[in-house]
């Protein structure tokens, strides 16, 4: 693959000019990755079609399941049917973006180490983590992005509640925070391939993590105020230790104008920032222990 030409900036280049030039270079590089991914998929249209049909079936089955559940009850833990579908669409948007851009690359990280292709990435005039994280994409997941967006719009229209432009901007920001959080977890986990050689548990890790994020935080509330229940233990762990519940619940509550305590949003932002910085440190530290294809 030929990389776009990168105009290297000198020490005398103004700061904002340097940032702009670097950003434009990486945007061009990302657009080339997307174009290459589409070309690869069109070489095997049957495989692409099967993936799309599978996503459509999974989406339809999940929506039908919760329509059936909500036909028997009006609310589940203060979430009405359309409010829950808004939450579901938010979770799908986050998952589909992560799986489209980052999952194929993180899953292939150990293969790059085994075959020596990681050496190639490290010798390119590009940030190694950017190249390792985004060089292969899964275009079939873009179908799920569209489905999730359609479900979100339909659910919000059914609720018929006014949404301010500020809420939309904040919602999109929180989506970006959530994607960053899950990416940070994923790339840090993938880095273990440098020591283990193979890391086949990445898909299992992602599957179990996203199971907990499929339901709003309030679902894990206890039923007995007099004792600390197992659901509340999970709620605490996945809210304050590893905020998996917050990164999906808070964006949904924001667009629904039912946001909870500001401490939840602060915890999500702080945890995501810490996770991203830590994942960057783990990646660079792992590369320091990488000995090349011959090892």
Predicted ranges, named:
Residues 1-22:
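N-terminal amphipathic/basic-hydrophobic helices that include classical n-h-c signal peptides
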Residues 19-295:
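Hydrophobic transmembrane alpha-helices and immediately adjacent juxtamembrane helices
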């Amino acid at each position: 693959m030929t990389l776009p030409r990168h105009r290297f900036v000198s020490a005398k280049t103004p700061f904002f000019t340097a940032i702009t030039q670097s950003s434009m270079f990486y945007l061009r590089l990302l657009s080339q990755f997307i174009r290459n991914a589409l070309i690869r998929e069109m070489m095997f249209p049957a495989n692409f079609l099967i993936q799309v049909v599978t996503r459509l079936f999974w989406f339809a089955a999940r929506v039908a399941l919760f329509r059936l559940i909500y036909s028997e009850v009006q609310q589940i833990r203060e979430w009405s049917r359309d409010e829950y579908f808004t939450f579901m669409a938010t979770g799908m948007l986050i998952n589909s973006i992560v799986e489209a851009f980052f999952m194929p690359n993180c899953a292939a990280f150990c293969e790059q180490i085994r075959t020596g292709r990681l050496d190639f990435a490290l010798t390119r005039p590009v940030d190694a983590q950017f190249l390792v994280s985004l060089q292969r994409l899964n275009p079939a997941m873009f179908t799920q992005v569209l489905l999730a967006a359609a479900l979100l719009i339909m659910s919000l229209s059914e609720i018929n509640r006014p949404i301010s432009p500020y809420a939309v901007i904040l919602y999109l920001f929180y989506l970006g925070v959530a994607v960053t959080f899950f990416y940070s977890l994923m790339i840090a986990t993938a880095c273990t391939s440098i020591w283990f050689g193979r890391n086949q548990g990445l898909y299992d890790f992602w599957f179990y993590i996203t199971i907990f994020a499929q339901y709003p935080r309030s679902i894990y509330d206890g039923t007995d105020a007099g004792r600390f229940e197992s659901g509340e233990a999970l709620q605490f762990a996945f809210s304050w230790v590893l905020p998996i519940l917050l990164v999906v619940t808070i964006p949904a509550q924001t667009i629904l104008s039912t946001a909870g305590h500001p401490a939840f949003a602060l915890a999500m932002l702080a945890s995501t920032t810490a996770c991203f910085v830590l994942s960057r440190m783990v990646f660079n530290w792992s590369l320091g222990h990488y000995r090349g294809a011959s090892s």
